Amino acid sequence: VGTRLPSVRELQQRYQVSPLTVQHVVRDLAAKGLVTVRPGSGTFVAAAPPRGPRPADLAWQHAALGGRTPQDMTRHLALLEAPHPDTIRMSGGYLDDSLIPEKALVASMTRAMRRTGVWGRAPVEGTAAARQWFARQSGGFDPAEVLITSGGQIALSIAIRALTRPGDAIVLETPTYPGYTAIARGHGLDIHPVPTDRDGLRTDLLEDVLRARVARLVVVQPLYANPTGGVLAPDRRRELLDLARRHGVFVLEDDYARDLSIGGAQPPTLASQDQHGHVVYVRSITKPVAPAVRLAALAARGPALARLRAAKTLEDFYVSGPLQEAAVDFLSSPAWQRHRRTVSRELGLRRDGLLAALRSRLPGVEVAHVPAGGMHLWARLPEGYDDADVAARALAAGVMVSAGSTWFTAEPEGAYLRLTYGETPVAQLVEGARRLASVL
């Protein structure tokens, strides 16, 4: 400490470098606190920096947290991670930036921010305008029966937790969105899977489950189910509502994809056909509008509404007023309908482009059902393949896909991949199929 370094000239001659290089090195050493420069005197070795605090010992948390981990969401959350820039994404659940109506959203947000009183605390139930819009879309609820939430995920969590108690039985489709499984297991529920096909939930098998045990809640995606793209058939809709009435269970309708139609007539919401308050309805605008617009509605009738409102107050409190105002401004404008047409057209092009590429390059991969909406193809791998292994090797080859086993509530009935076309242009989807073919 305190030793004087040789002069710049000496260092230059000793190491055969330029004076500029020596100056850069000295400046870097000084920035790190290793040397001290004293003008007119020279450069000296600095005193050893004080030792920092000892590294934190976080091992105690393992004992405090216990052995339970949210395994059900681990692989699913990995799909939300940003891959390498050169990786083609065929695994996510949102539209890509090219399909976000940015200019219209900015205009709506600008108008919303200028409104008087918008920066105050919004009502717990949501603004009147937002509740009215979602009530009209639901087809079965009054605005007073609608609660606005910060996105669809929190709405689903509130509904499942509020309508059940730990230890209760809950019926989930299989395959289905793994977020339901994670919520149910986190709440200590007893999960009973019921298979689906292209016509939605197998109500004949649901009847067997409900006859054998008391369940409180059945969770369904009647329209463009994730991941299969199936639509609940008219006869099964009637049977589901009849089973709910006879067995006294709630039905949670996750209507996440109504604004992601590619073509053809859509059935009405299940809630619109429910007379006795069995259906609890969730509708989000995040997927069709933009990932940053985290806004959804949760609707119910009777005592269930009061239970949901109390749970929402604890878990979600109130939603940003400017966000609600901006969303309603956009959804009530001609820009929204133009955007829906654009999304429908582009999703159709992407779906068909990916299907053609799969049939050309991967004839052994079977897509049994071509969805009329949503963002995903449910593709069965040939016998002998492991979906998790294929997904891992595909990622190494530069294409990110989702292993089908992530989506099964029970044992997988085969090896599948969920291939997303909503977040990737056609040319990249074709290249993604080529990369996937290289690992099969």
Where are the predicted features?
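AMP-binding (ANL) adenylation modules
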Residues: T406-P412
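N-terminal basic, amphipathic alpha-helical segments
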Residues: V1-T110, R309, T313-V319, L331, ...
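PLP-dependent aminotransferase class I/II
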Residues: V279-S360, V367-H369
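Conserved core of the PLP fold type I
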Residues: T116-H247, D259-H276
